[in-house]
Design a protein with these regions (language model features):
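Membrane-targeting and insertion segments and their boundary/processing signals
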Residues: 2-6, 46, 140
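A cross-family phosphate/adenosyl-ligand binding-site feature
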Residues: 2-30, 147-155
């Protein structure tokens, strides 16, 4: 006989959340806000240029980073004024007029490190949206912009961070789609508060 959990029983839900998924999910707004704080501190200032960018290239492996790239491409491809390209490795044509976002959760992924190395060598402006550690950090040290997650959550819950980085980068390059990342964080927090374990299911 399978055990059942009353979804209106907050204590039972929290007790059943052995891997901390509920807490990790509730941190989505905080992840977005952390990106907003980094931007306010000037993290993306090196992206600004008088020269028009040719393309934004989103390089990622599998997982939430790839999902974020697909969401951004689908949601903004008809809005932004420059191409948004998703890839699993740095394109051979990348150059000084391009912006590359290297997104992932594994700082030891050799494909991401190789993309950083190639992008910086060819003069592209490179943003790393991944943990600031290991080979990936070494490959971008002093040559790439780091927007590493300031809050660590399980990889399956890092989508909010990747989306916030992508939206922020696009906003710097195209003022017509510039998002208010802090407002987005507030909206996400509001959604989380409406879906906490302490609220009745059908409210």
């Amino acid at each position: 006989m399978n055990a059942t959990i009353d979804l209106d029983d907050a204590e039972a839900l929290l007790a059943a959340d052995l891997d901390g998924s509920l807490q990790a999910a509730s941190m989505a707004g905080s992840q977005v806000r952390a990106v907003g704080t980094a931007i306010a501190e000037g993290a993306l200032e090196p992206l600004r240029s008088e020269d028009r960018s040719r393309a934004v290239v989103w390089v990622s492996g599998r997982g939430t980073a790839a999902t974020a790239g697909a969401i951004l491409a689908g949601a903004l491809s008809d809005t932004v004024s420059l191409p948004f390209v998703t890839a699993t490795r740095a394109p051979v044509w990348v150059g000084p007029l391009d912006v590359m976002v290297i997104a992932g959760d594994d700082a030891g992924d050799p494909a991401l490190s190789a993309a950083v190395t190639l992008g910086t060598r060819r003069g592209a402006r490179v943003v790393i949206a991944a943990p600031d550690e290991g080979p990936l950090a070494d490959s971008g040290a002093g040559r790439a912009i780091s927007l590493a997650p300031r809050l660590r959550v399980p990889d399956t819950f890092s989508l909010a961070h990747h989306l916030a980085v992508g939206a922020a980068v696009l906003g710097v390059l195209d003022k017509s789609v510039a998002p208010d990342v802090m407002t987005i964080a507030d909206e996400v927090d509001g959604e989380v508060s409406r879906n906490t374990v302490g609220r009745e299911v059908f409210t």
